């Protein structure tokens, strides 16, 4: 046998193990006598038995620079990292219906605990058509229409009406033109006071 050919390709492959009476015994199989004289930078492709065949392996995964992913990256069919982020895998989802949503755990996955009602039930003395919202979006007992400016409108009728003056905190008389009113337009002073005065 030519020494060069012998040096280029000779392999013994371990193809598996099995247990007999509690002890582990290795089964070995000599890989076929394929002779390959080509030099492969990344080694040879292995067959189904784990023995090299006369075909060079592709280059390892390309070096990729990706933005950070909170849950890691998707791995492609070749075992290489992609720049696609893995989605959050929450596993089983709770089947309890929560009208205001579920409280998330530390990973952001929904738990079986419901969020509380975000806004308190209002107990206002006055009824508003549109309530003023607070900083977290919950309605207050203030009426939006009371915050609107006095609006006479473009028409020329002189209809006595009342509006709530935010600056003075009082309901004042004005003459409405008869068209294009806003919400701060009341027929009687008592209506204005009931709706807008605290």
Curated annotation (Swiss-Prot):
Assigned GO CC terms: extracellular space
Superkingdom to which the source organism belongs: Eukaryota
Lineage, highest ranks first: Eukaryota, Metazoa, Spiralia, Lophotrochozoa, Mollusca
Source species of the chain: Margaritifera margaritifera
Tissues and organs where the protein is expressed, per its UniProt entry: Nacreous layer of shell (at protein level).
Pfam families noted in UniProt: Antistasin, Kunitz_BPTI
Cysteine-cysteine disulfides: 146-196, 155-179, 171-192
Signal peptide: 1-19
Subcellular location: Secreted
Domain Antistasin-like: from-to ranges: 31-56, 56-85, 85-114, 114-143
GO molecular function annotations of the record: serine-type endopeptidase inhibitor activity
InterPro entries tied to this protein: Antistasin-like, Hirudin/antistatin, Kunitz_BPTI, Kunitz_BPTI_sf, Prtase_inh_Kunz-CS, TFPI/VKTCI-like
Keywords noted in UniProt: Disulfide bond, Protease inhibitor, Repeat, Secreted, Serine protease inhibitor, Signal
Stated name of the protein: BPTI/Kunitz domain-containing protein 4
Keyword Signal recorded: yes
Sequence ranges assigned to domain BPTI/Kunitz inhibitor in this UniProt record: 146-196
